């Protein structure tokens, strides 16, 4: 392997640096202080160009689907206006909609929950997690292009992934992934369609995590997971060497790839940054599928697992050395090149995926797949692409976005005297993910780039110690990038995608009465001989369990009142029979911590205990009618023994 001087940050620099201060001379490698490739383009001050505004009553050109990090929800924005259009609760408990409290949402949370998780939650008085750390949102693909069926997202906090239906923009499935810990990187298969969603386990732990070997790091392992995107269950898993960070997939359906910043399997920051080189893991999908089909796997916690660690010398994986603590892993729309950001190295490594067959079947030297390694600046994290062969990489430490040309970087790596860097733009501040419109598909556009900055500092009015993030809109239609908008966002978007509305023609404004979301609720109603598709006001008592069926048509509930006994478990089932767009109802039970959304033609239900005797008003918390305030009724709770 070619020997190259390591030009990243020293370990001392890493420990002494803070995100809020620049890393100056003496704390960076010599490349950053020389007139190397990274220094040839003069950074431009962020300038104001076309403002990207959308007039009242006009629609945005694109949907933006945002993660929210520790808030646990998905957000929908309009691009270029950057107006927030909707929040879709996923892993979080949502007070507005009742997500995480309605019976329908609890079933989705619990469907794949492990017994260990149920035990942990029960010990803390819970049925489900009420938090999540949602980093990445990606859409399903067909033939390398978005197909508008599903959106997928991860939960790093509780080792889960979720699926949102694009026709109603509601979560329809959550999967807890066994054996792995801390699902971070997550990408759908691009070709021929998203049969799989690939998920990276970031955190190291024993596979048999029962406390018997918890101090023996030699028993720790990381897991790469393929989730069946249609069945929403684990298809197979691969043991790997090192940990897993971000991932992506190719445009032929042959490969998936993941970065690893902890090839050392270190347990401390110093140990994790010790090596000059880490790696990218390449997964051979066909070989893994062949082994699974032939029964050549071990079953661990009900999952089929193959061994792709280095010492296994299998055809499942190959490891390509990359400097240093690599992070972003982004496949270009040219179908050929994978860009891996160095994070602690000022470089992005460009891999030619057409050379991967030789790594597996011809014993080619791992770095033979490297075709470019441009020096771009300090702290490269992620790369986005336009449709003209250009790449855009975020530089966390430099607080910049750098535009560079992939073909010219390859020519420079081969020895040609050419500078692939086309432009640099200051952003505010410390950028992480960035995305062009449709840039992770074969339909990459050339108009807008969104850069998600981790710090806003002085860009907005001071709102206290916790500041908003800053999502910046950048015009990339010309030769130079132009900053056109600052967008404050609540904690903490990590990633986003931008999608043409033409891909989403089937978004509904009114629910289908046969929707599977409330199928189990309908089954219970049928057992109770209640028709929830018609006006109903039934009350069913089953011991100390009471089911109250009611219909809502603005501005009234079919049940002006109902009576239960102290200590009863009460389930209220509400069906909104209005068929008008945007006529959402709600049901809130006063002084019981109960509230839920009931969209037009939707059925929703919620269960609670009526613990105290007395009169309690329920009401519609959505403003659905001029007589909205009058849309209410009483629950009478009779004292025990009355």
UniProtKB/Swiss-Prot annotation:
The region annotated as signal peptide is 1-46
Against InterPro entries, the record matches this protein to: CcO_II-like_C, Cupredoxin, N2O_reductase_N, N2OR_C, NO_Rdtase, Nos_propeller, NOS_propeller_2, NosZ/Cyto_c_oxidase_sub2
Question: How is this protein named in the record?
Answer: Nitrous-oxide reductase
Instruction: Give GO cellular component annotations, separated by semicolons.
Output: membrane; periplasmic space
Pathway(s) served: Nitrogen metabolism; nitrate reduction (denitrification); dinitrogen from nitrate: step 4/4
- Region spans: COX2-like: 544-642
**Physiological role:** Nitrous-oxide reductase is part of a bacterial respiratory system which is activated under anaerobic conditions in the presence of nitrate or nitrous oxide.
Q: What are the alphabetically sorted keywords of the record?
A: Calcium, Copper, Metal-binding, Oxidoreductase, Periplasm, Signal
Coiled-coil stretches: none
Principal place where this protein is found? Answer: periplasm
Residues annotated as binding Ca(2+) 1 are 454, 469
Q: Quick one: which residues bind Cu cation Z1?
A: 327, 382
- Keyword Lipid metabolism on entry: no
Source domain of life is: Bacteria
Look up the EC number in the record and give it: 1.7.2.4
- What cofactor does its activity depend on? Ca(2+); Cu cation
Organism listed in the record? Achromobacter cycloclastes
Enzyme's top EC category: oxidoreductase
Encoding gene per record: nosZ
Q: Which residues bind Cu cation Z4?
A: 494
């Amino acid at each position: 392997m070619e020997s190259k001087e390591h030009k990243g940050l020293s370990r001392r620099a890493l420990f002494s640096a803070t995100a809020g201060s620049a890393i100056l001379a003496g704390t960076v490698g010599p490349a950053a202080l020389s007139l190397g490739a990274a220094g040839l383009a003069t950074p431009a001050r962020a300038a104001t160009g076309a403002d990207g505004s959308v007039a009242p009553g006009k629609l945005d050109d694109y949907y933006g689907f945002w993660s929210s990090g520790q808030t646990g929800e998905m957000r929908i924005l309009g691009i270029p206006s950057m107006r927030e259009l909707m929040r879709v609760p996923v892993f979080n408990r949502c007070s507005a909609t009742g997500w995480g409290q309605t019976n329908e949402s609890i079933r989705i949370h619990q469907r794949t929950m492990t017994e260990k998780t149920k035990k942990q939650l029960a010990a803390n008085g819970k049925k489900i997690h009420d938090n999540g750390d949602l980093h990445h949102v990606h859409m399903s693909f067909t033939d390398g292009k978005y197909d508008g069926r599903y959106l997928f997202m991860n939960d790093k906090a509780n080792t889960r992934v979720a699926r949102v239906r694009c026709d109603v923009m509601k979560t329809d499935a959550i999967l807890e992934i066994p054996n792995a810990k801390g699902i971070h990187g997550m990408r759908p298969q691009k070709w021929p369609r998203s049969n799989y969603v690939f998920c990276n386990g970031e955190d190291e732990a024993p596979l048999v995590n029962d406390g018997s070997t918890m101090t023996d790091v030699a028993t720790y392992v990381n897991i790469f997971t393929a989730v069946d995107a249609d069945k929403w269950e684990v298809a197979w898993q691969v043991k790997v060497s090192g940990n897993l960070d971000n991932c992506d997939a190719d445009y032929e359906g042959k490969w998936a790839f993941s970065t690893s910043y902890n090839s050392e399997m270190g347990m401390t920051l110093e140990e994790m940054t010790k090596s000059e080189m880490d790696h990218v893991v390449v997964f051979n999908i066909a070989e893994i599928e062949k082994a699974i089909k032939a029964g050549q796997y071990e079953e661990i916690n009900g999952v089929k697992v193959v061994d792709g660690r280095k010492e296994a010398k299998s055809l499942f994986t190959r490891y390509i050395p990359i400097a240093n603590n690599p992070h972003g892993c982004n496949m270009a729309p040219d179908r050929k090149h994978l860009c891996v950001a160095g994070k602690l190295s000022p470089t992005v490594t460009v891999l030619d995926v057409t050379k991967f067959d030789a790594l597996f079947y011809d014993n080619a030297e791992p770095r033979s797949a490297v075709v470019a390694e441009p020096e771009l600046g300090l702290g490269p994290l992620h790369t986005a692409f336009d449709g003209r062969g250009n790449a855009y990489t975020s530089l966390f430490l430099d607080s910049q976005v750098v535009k560079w040309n992939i073909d010219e970087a390859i020519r420079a790596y081969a020895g040609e005297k050419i500078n692939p860097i086309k432009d640099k733009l200051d952003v505010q501040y410390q950028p992480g993910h960035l995305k062009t419109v449709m840039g992770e598909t074969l339909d990459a556009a050339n108009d807008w780039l969104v850069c998600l900055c981790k710090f806003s500092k002085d860009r907005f009015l001071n709102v206290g110690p916790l500041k908003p993030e800053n999502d910046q809109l950048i015009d990339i239609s010309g030769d130079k990038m132009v900053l056109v908008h600052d967008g404050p966002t609540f904690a903490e978007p990590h990633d986003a995608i931008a999608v043409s509305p033409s891909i989403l023609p089937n978004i509904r404004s009114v629910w289908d009465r046969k929707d599977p979301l409330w199928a189990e609720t309908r089954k219970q109603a049928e057992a109770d001989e209640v028709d929830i598709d018609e006006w109903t006001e039934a009350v069913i008592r089953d011991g100390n369990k009471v089911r109250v069926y009611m219909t809502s048509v603005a501005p009234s509930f079919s049940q002006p009142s109902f009576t239960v006994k102290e200590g009863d478990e009460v389930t209220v089932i509400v069906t909104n029979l209005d068929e008008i767009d945007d006529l959402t109802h709600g049901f809130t039970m006063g002084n019981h911590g109960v509230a839920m959304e009931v969209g037009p033609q939707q059925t929703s239900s919620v269960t609670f205990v009526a613990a105290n005797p007395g009169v309690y008003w329920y009401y519609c918390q959505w403003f659905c009618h001029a007589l909205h305030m009058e849309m209410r009724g009483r629950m009478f709770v009779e004292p025990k023994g009355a």
